[in-house]
């Protein structure tokens, strides 16, 4: 949760919220876009030959704490793991999230602060920022024992699951995903023809 001198500004979504249909964790969203047809657009990519599955063998490959609120946002079906963030649901809070495309999340503010501390070679405060966020998601904060950049990438992976933001963190941190992906050319975006001089 974020606080100011007058009290709370934001609180984190809970596991109960997810159960009630808050599949975008909207309490954590600071800014989002909207698309009224989002569920319709996503439908062809779920439970078909074109399914968008997560690159993991098991949910524990992604989440190191089974109580992690974000772990409820994935589903194991037919030996494949899917993000449920863009799937239709009839739960109570579904109408609030069905058209949301999160752009800035509260967690990102913690990542920015953690990166700042890391740039000042203050590993203790850098990991503390990640620990605060982990605690808000019901994760044990004491599991942050590895390299800061690796820990940050792991947290970003959990935070932005299925949203496309992880790509930019890999680029920014000059890291490769932990699975076989072929060439580094996948991280090089083509230059538009109108920018060739």
List the model feature ranges, each with a label.
Residues 1-48, 52-54, 58-197:
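Acidic/polar-rich alpha-helix caps and helix-coil junctions
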């Amino acid at each position: 949760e974020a606080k100011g001198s007058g009290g709370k500004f934001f609180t984190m979504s809970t596991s109960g919220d997810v159960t009630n249909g808050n599949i975008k964790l909207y309490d954590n969203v600071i800014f989002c876009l909207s698309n009224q047809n989002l569920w319709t657009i996503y439908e062809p990519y779920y439970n078909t030959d074109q399914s968008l599955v997560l690159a993991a063998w098991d949910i524990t490959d992604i989440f190191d704490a089974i109580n992690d609120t974000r772990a409820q946002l994935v589903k194991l079906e037919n030996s494949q793991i899917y993000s449920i963030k863009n799937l239709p649901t009839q739960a109570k809070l579904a109408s609030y999230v069905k058209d949301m495309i999160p752009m800035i999340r509260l967690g990102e503010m913690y990542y920015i602060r953690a990166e700042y501390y890391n740039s000042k070679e203050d590993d203790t405060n850098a990991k503390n920022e990640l620990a605060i966020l982990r605690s808000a998601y019901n994760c044990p904060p004491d599991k942050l024992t590895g390299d800061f950049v690796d820990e940050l990438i792991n947290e970003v992976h959990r935070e932005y699951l299925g949203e496309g933001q992880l790509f930019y963190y890999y680029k920014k941190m000059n890291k490769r995903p932990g699975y076989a992906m072929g060439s580094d050319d996948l991280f090089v975006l083509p230059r538009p023809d109108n920018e060739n001089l």
